[in-house]
Structure formats: structure tokens, C-alpha cells
Amino acid sequence: MSKQVGLIHSLKDGQSYMEIWPVRKELNAIFPEQRIIKATRFGIKVMPAVAAISVLTQMAFNNYDSLPQAIVVALFAISMPLQGMWWLGSRSNTKLPPALASWYRELHQKITETGFALEPVKARPRYKELAVILNRAFRQLDKTALERWF
């Protein structure tokens, strides 16, 4: 990543990247995004409850000596989905390696050849642009057009 971004900006980018990335089984073997997205969504649902339970059980059993450890466990549990969103945010702003950049250009060309309007091809695409192109390809291209890549 050539340009440093702040933590809050990276978390927001991660949230939007979770929505943009196409959740398709064909992409599982190539990209780790789907596994990270699945774990992050699970963490968003479950980890606040884990954090609350870890603190409340110590309080319910009057075990106030272990409360500091329970608070550390709660903070760790709450930080897990944030770590996933941070990773996704920094990944979305990372420039594509040359092989993936050429794949991005091929997909972009294939979509524009079929008559669909797209924004101009980026000179140095990022994973964010690849996600948009993959989404568009899965929605608008037929299976025979996608056979070459998947």
C-alpha cells in the first residue's frame, strides 16, 4: 500500500469492501477475502455477546479478583471483528500485482465488449476495483464467457 490511511478510514473501507466483494465459491481458492468476510461477519454477531458474558459471569459469581482478566478477554473479543475490517480495508486499497492487474484488464475488456458501460480502466488498479469488476462480471456475463477464468 503506497498511501497511508487512518484507522477509521481503513475500517470504513473494510465495511464497504465487505459489501462489494462477490461471495462466490469460484473465488475461494484464489482469494482469502471470502473467508475473512465470513469470519468478520460472524465476529460482528457473536463477539459482543462473548465480551459481555466474560465480564458478567465474573460479576455474577462475585469473582472480582478475576475481573481484570475478563475485561482483557472482552476487549480482545470486541477487537476481533475490527481486525477483520481493518485487514479488508487495507487490502481494498492495495495495488494489484501484475498478474491480477492483467486479469482485471481482460475482464474489463470482456465486459465492455459485451456492450455494458463501465468506468474507464484504471492504470494501477486496486483490489477494490477488482471486486467491482468481478461483481459486474458475475452479474452480467454468461457462464461461457467466464469459463476461461473459472
Curated annotation (Swiss-Prot):
Main location: membrane
Protein location: Cell inner membrane
Transmembrane segment boundaries: 42-62, 70-90
UniProt-listed InterPro entries: UPF0208 (IPR007334)
Swiss-Prot/TrEMBL keywords: Cell inner membrane, Cell membrane, Membrane, Transmembrane, Transmembrane helix
Entry keyword Ribonucleoprotein: no
Membrane topology qualifier: Multi-pass membrane protein
Record GO cellular component, one term: plasma membrane
Family per record: Belongs to the UPF0208 family.
Protein name: UPF0208 membrane protein VIBHAR_02941
Species this protein is from: Vibrio campbellii (strain ATCC BAA-1116)
